[in-house]
Amino acid sequence: MAEALLIIDFQNDFTPPDGALAVPDGDRIAEPVNELAASPRFELVIATRDWHPPDHESFTERGGVWPEHCVRDTHGAELHPALDREERVDLVLDKGQDPATPGYSAFERPELGRLLRERGIDALTIAGLATDVCVRSTALDAIQEGYRVEIAGDATRGVDPAGSERALQEIRENGGRVAWAAASRTS
């Protein structure tokens, strides 16, 4: 079994204190994410970024539900500085570039599936932001693509606690697992 770690959207705009769409405690995932990324169990570590054009349909100014965030080539779209990118991230994959699609799932880009297949990856651990949006969408798409999926519960945070719990339950119901290192439990 070959396993990859996907770090979903650990970006400045999703983290307090100044993120345009800050996930509560989103900055607190840095340590568990870096610990995971340093683990020898992963054949590949990929970080994704929301990398929106300025006219993205998800922005409230254009009739969408989200404030403007992660606009490409801005400070907000950069990976969070606490992510040990140089030492631990093998590839950065941008998503959400089409202004007419939400871009929640890392699997919107066919390159991801192709790369994982080429490397013989059959299991994914997913960490990052936000549990109830992009982590959820990526996990469900990965399960549908046939990957074994584990969510690193300690290394994710969501926009809404109730929505995050619903997302984790949906992932479990579809065959994924949720692991909590701090509590030494898996569900």
What are these regions (language model features)?
Residues 108, 138, 163-164:
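Residues at alpha-helix caps and immediate loop-helix transition turns in enzyme cores, especially N-
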Residues 100-103, 156-160:
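Short, small-residue-enriched loops and turns at beta-alpha junctions
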Residues 36, 136-144:
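Histidine-anchored nucleotide/phosphate-binding helix
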Residues 80, 135-136:
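Short, well-ordered alpha-helical microsegments
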Residues 1-96, 148-150, 159-160, 165-187:
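Active-site acidic carboxylates
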